[in-house]
């Protein structure tokens, strides 16, 4: 059942915002008003479409009492009634609580798990998969930290991804990704299983998270290249430790000033993510509105090379086009995960 009082409140708020922006009072707040107005517009459009449909149905029902108009009404009413469920579903979707982080840029972190060199190679495959997907979306990917292995794998990669709805599209990628394949170093042709962990964090702004300078320990050290050799002769790498949580962030570009900026950016994102997780836990002990448990240690997906298969275990989705997926063709997976999360939210709201 759609709450009519809420529809009225949203419409009245939208009209107020429209009038406030037209008046131009309080110029400092115009940006905030415009943002809220923009967020409400698609909701109000769905409300208008739904209310128009109800109004048309009411008019058609009245026409049944007019002998001249009754044939037209009898033809129109079934069409209007058949359109009603779709309009209700679209409106319910528009009314779902919005994650304010959805429009934010994101930090992507990938680290190998069990599996040694093969896990590091798989971590590299995953990073390239996300890079290719970002290209298809027109997003910008900036590398923050990259530690490679001698075989071309990745020990750790941290990247900043900026563009439209980055976090909304990538947030369900967090978790353990498992690969089953024959390693190139395996002479016996045996299939090995290894894993890598992906974390996608929304970028945090100062308004999102406050960090007390007294809670930080900042160390400088020599940057190291492959094999551990020093890549310059000055102390440029920066390590920041957040003492209350024990979180440690490092950055090792050539500029110490830039390293400090990058490390703080990553630290803010991780602390913001911790706070979001804490709030989510308080709101829903069973995390019913999330895809999976939301736990980064949860195995979310398996990439089976011998079968050319990708399976997402949270929604039991299996695709037999692994090559395309690893080339960045992720929309079908992401759309299915998003739809599943929305369906869970709707069910949760209906309880």
From Swiss-Prot:
Residues 278-297 are annotated as: Disordered. Its main location: cytoplasm. Keywords: Cytoplasm, Methylation, Protein biosynthesis. SMART domains: PCRF (SM00937). It is found in: Cytoplasm. One of its GO terms (cellular component) is cytoplasm. Disulfide bonds: none annotated. Pfam families: PCRF, RF-1. GO terms for molecular function: translation release factor activity, codon specific. It comes from the Bacteria. Methylated by PrmC. Methylation increases the termination efficiency of RF1. The modification N5-methylglutamine is found at residue 229. Transmembrane segments: none annotated. Belongs to the prokaryotic/mitochondrial release factor family. Peptide chain release factor 1 directs the termination of translation in response to the peptide chain termination codons UAG and UAA. HAMAP family: Rel_fac_1 (MF_00093). This is Peptide chain release factor 1. It comes from Roseobacter denitrificans (strain ATCC 33942 / OCh 114) (Erythrobacter sp. (strain OCh 114)).
